[in-house]
Amino acid sequence: MMLNGERIISKPLRWAMVGGGRLSQVGYKHRIGALRDNTAFQLTAGAFDIDAERGKDFGVNLGVDAERCYPNYQTMFAEEAKRQDGIEVVSIATPNGTHYEICKAALEAGVHVICEKPLFFTSAEGQEIKALAEKKGKIVGVTYGFSGNQMLLQMRAMIEQGMIGDIRVVDLQYTHGFCATDEGEKISAAQKWRVDPAIAGPSFVLGDLSTHTYYMSQLIMPKMKIKELLCDRQSFVGSRAPLEDNAHVLMHYENGAVGTMWTSSINAGCMDGHRIRIVGSKASIEWWDSKPNELTYEVQGEPGQTLVRGMPYLDDVCNADERLGALHSEGLSEAWANIYLKFAIAIDAKNREDEEILNNLVYPDIDAGIEGIRWIENCVRSANQGSVWVEFK
């Protein structure tokens, strides 16, 4: 059965945003994701911009009541808590260094949270927020937007069904060339903060890019755990040091498999080098973000196959997220809508204390966010010690 916008939860969740304003690169992706299924979320408030007047003007143009366009998140949480129809969930679409304080304030105000990645600077902060969320009975979701591509669930099903055999090699890549020079930092505030350690944290592309692909690999292969890794990172544009614009990571998994991750913003000429290839003892499967509706399945000694999204031969877990049918292409907008719909289902289940749904729903939750921080921490630790093998802690 295809998703068609019908009600899946009892009523739309009253939703707000912190950040994601007129000048934001990512804010529109959040709104596309949340509002694609208009029975799941309703945008009712926001602190959209560090410039309060610009944020208010933007919010009004989105259809938000002027009185609920707030100058900052502190005021929003305080004022919304006084209302009978106050917000129930907030999305945090701000620079990395602000995530922790906003997330903590939201939970203390009794509001569910959906947050940009990387979640926080340290895994210790992640554990603290996880404990607070559990105490308050709230959900924290993380917007690993690419993970909403349903062909990734097809990969997961094929691996679980033994269709590629034992996993031997994991080949991960997320690269582009848009930061091959420092011109972006000169004209874009969003790019400038990404290479500022005080705002971005301990990494650039490891946090900004590779966390997406790392989570996707976990989604596809939930039983695969990294035993140790080695990270070599570079700042080819020197002004970005100590943050990296290129990194290679080697991985040893607990089952004996090996893996690689190449993440880069200086892959000159590359528009979208985002791919995952899993090599098994029987066959290999591969997915490219530039062709999100297709999955390559190659059995040793047989002609290669291209599996296409929306077709009845795919697993039910994949087709459960189908929206447009195989005749039409789906892409990033649908992927974001898929994860936002799962956030809504998780929040609704949490509100109703429906543990069965929560235990069976696959979505990027706070544990996924903490695991992404651990990935960054271990990569940076290896690189800073001279690119040595380190235990994955």
UniProtKB/Swiss-Prot annotation:
Keywords: Oxidoreductase. InterPro entries: Gfo/Idh/MocA-like_OxRdtase_C, Gfo/Idh/MocA-like_OxRdtase_N, Gfo/Idh/MocA_oxidoreduct, NAD(P)-bd_dom_sf. It comes from the Bacteria. Its EC number is 1.-.-.-. It is an enzyme of class 1 (oxidoreductase). GO terms for molecular function: nucleotide binding; oxidoreductase activity. Belongs to the Gfo/Idh/MocA family. This is Uncharacterized oxidoreductase YfiI. The lineage of its organism: Bacteria, Bacillati, Bacillota, Bacilli, Bacillales.
